[in-house]
Structures are given as structure tokens and as C-alpha cells.
Amino acid sequence: EFGAPVNIDLKFTHNKTPLQITGNLGQLSGIFNPEEQWPLNLTITAVGSAVYIAGHITNIMEVKGVDLKLAAKGPDLANFQQITGEPLPIKGAFDIAGHLTAATLENFKISDIAILLGESRISGEIALNQKSPRPHINAKFHSKKLDLRPFIKQDSGGSITEEKNKKIETKSDKVFSAEPLDLKALYLIDAAVSFRADQILGHRIALDKFQIGLNLKNGRLIIKPLTTNMGGGDLTSSLELLAKGN
């Protein structure tokens, strides 16, 4: 009925992989009422994983007043290769959640972000405002433990030596090109991003109390602070780039 909620149970295949979408949506008449909160509750299952979407959209025709809880959980991200047809750079069990709110498509925020990938945990929030002179991103993230080892290919000692020998045989000893860097991309967006990690693990190095702040505005990129504890010593650095015309 036009005034009744809509139940969904859709099954289909993609790349010979079965997928299923179940749940319910608000009544069809609510789609045309910009003052009515249009509810939706969906579960998408595939390759042993599930994606959950629950909440409402106040004005669905103009996509305004979005308030959705998002979650995804599964045994191995690598299983999604069956759907994409391409191998993913990240493998292992995952559990992801977030809260999407958007007054309009030009201004949205994902808060209460919680990401669990293997032994790594990341929390934070990110917001995008496209009403400014240029798109502005504001993001804050924190990780108690970020284990990069499953995502970084570890080269053997022989391959590293071979690479070093190739560099020695190079005719030029220049580290940087004499040509100016093309920094025009710095004008595309403004951003304020911060990331803190209690511990970051690599194959041959471990960083403690890592902190980085990135501020990009009007083509000027400032990375400050950039601090960490490595091998028992403290490291502090900063970087500033300014995009200019020729």
C-alpha cells in the first residue's frame, strides 16, 4: 500500500557471488513529504560479512536531514575480492561503526567512528563542509594500537641490498629534482586533520606517543606538531609548504 511501510528481501549475484539485502523502509507517501522523517533499516550480507544501515532521512527527495547509524563486520576483508574482482590491500577480520549526520549533502559529519582491523583500533570523527569557498575537511583520529605489519610488505635483506646497489650505480647523485614541485593540488581543499597513536608497530620499528597535526588553508600546508618517541628518544619535526604561481 502507498501508506504502508515497505519490507525488502532482495537476493542477487555479482561476479557469481550471492548478495542479500533485507530490512524495511518508510511508507512510500513519506518520500514526498519534506517534513516527515523517512525511516530505513537495512542489512546487506555477502561473503560472510554484513553491513547495517539504520536511521532516517527527513527530506529524501533533496537528501536533507540524514541521520544514520552505520556498521560493518566480517571475518576477512580479503573476501570482498570475490565482489570487486581485485585483491584488497587490507586483510583480516574487521568491525567498523560510525554515525552519519547531514543537514544537506554539502555539509555532513561521521562521528563515533570505531574501526577494528586485526589488532589495530582507530576511533575519531570526520566532517566535510562544501559551503566554504573551497571544500573544508575537519578530522580527528586516535589509535591506542596501530599495527601496520599486516599491511606492509617486508622485503628480504637481499632485495634491500640489490636496491641499494642500483642507487649506487645511478649516474646522478641528486636527491631532489631541480624542477619546482607542482603544489596546485593544495588549492583544491582546506583541511584540519589530527592523528594520535599511543603505539605504531612496523616490521623494524615501533613508534610510541605519535602525534601529527595537518593544517591546509589557501594553498599553505603546515604539518605541526609531528612528534613521537622512537628507540627511547624523542623526535620532533615540522613542515610547511606554500603553493605559489610561477
Where do the PLM segments sit?
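Membrane-proximal interfacial segments on either side of biological membranes
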Residues: 1-97, 101-109, 118-224, 229-246
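Gly/lys/ser-thr-rich phosphate-binding loops in alpha/beta enzymes
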Residues: 113
